[in-house]
């Protein structure tokens, strides 16, 4: 745990913040031409905004996460809902093997586990906030269980729909399989690029906000236990948030 905390601060958390901020602006470039230094400056603005939100209020940051999470679910539900009525039986029931890839055995199992594990990897992040949650003994298990069920349903539904509309080779070779799936759905096909770009922006904004919210709590908790620099245990006198930890992580992410 000690090593994980230090690695998180120096090697994983700030880079993930910067990568997500840049990803948001890259998706925005689908609508507005943004390049070079301007792109990076806009990414910095996004980080600054969420830093301010999460320093100012834990409750306000939590409410924003609820809103952005609801907005994340809606487009997935739309694609799944329309897709279920447009499944192609011959594709869904096809047993054609994937060319050039392992189709069975330990190699295929490892590849599948690696991919799906990454998709569910963020679940533990909710526990970082347990010290600031009302009635955590009840709400933490409930939140983790409901989150797992909802995410599993969305992922399974999206995978099922994609498997009934896209061939296995299309899914394997496409750089943007969700965009390809949306392009084949009636009613939204002609707007697939726009819809997927908006979906991506919403999803990454939610991820960026949550990372800025929960990641500094690792260093904050370690500092309280004298396992990290003591200054990271500072709490804002008015907002009661670990402002120093949030600010330093923001600064490292921008660099």
PLM features: residue spans?
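TM-loop-TM module centered on a large, flexible mid-protein loop between adjacent transmembrane helices
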Residues: 1, 29-34, 143-209, 228-255
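Membrane-interface loop-to-helix entry segments
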Residues: 38-89, 103, 144-148
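Membrane-interface helix termini and inter-helical loops of multi-pass transporters
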Residues: 25-32, 88-101, 168-176
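Residue-level signal for alpha-helical transmembrane segments in multi-pass membrane proteins
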Residues: 15, 49-57, 75-86, 157-161, ...
């Amino acid at each position: 745990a000690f090593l994980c905390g230090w690695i998180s601060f120096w090697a994983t958390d700030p880079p993930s913040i910067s990568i997500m901020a840049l990803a948001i602006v890259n998706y925005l470039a689908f609508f507005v031409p943004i390049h070079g230094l301007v792109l990076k400056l806009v990414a910095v603005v996004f980080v600054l905004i969420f830093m301010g939100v999460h320093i100012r209020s834990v409750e306000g940051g939590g409410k924003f996460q609820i809103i952005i999470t609801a907005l994340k679910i809606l487009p997935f539900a739309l694609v799944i809902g329309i897709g279920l009525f447009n499944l192609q039986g011959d594709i869904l029931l096809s047993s054609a093997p994937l060319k050039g890839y392992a189709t069975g055995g330990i190699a295929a199992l490892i590849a599948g586990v690696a991919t799906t594990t990454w998709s569910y990897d963020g679940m533990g992040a909710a526990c970082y906030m347990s010290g600031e949650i009302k009635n955590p003994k009840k709400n933490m298990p409930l939140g983790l269980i409901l989150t797992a069920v909802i995410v599993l349903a969305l992922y399974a539904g999206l995978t099922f729909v994609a498997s009934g509309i896209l061939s296995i080779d299309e899914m394997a070779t496409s750089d943007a399989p969700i965009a390809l799936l949306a392009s084949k759905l009636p009613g939204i096909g002609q707007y697939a690029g726009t819809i997927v770009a908006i979906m991506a922006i919403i999803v990454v904004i939610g991820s960026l906000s949550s990372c800025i919210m929960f990641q500094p709590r690792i260093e904050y908790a370690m500092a309280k236990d004298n396992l990290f620099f003591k200054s990271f245990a500072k709490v804002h006198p008015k907002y009661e948030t670990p402002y120093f930890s949030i600010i330093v992580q923001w600064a490292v992410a921008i660099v």
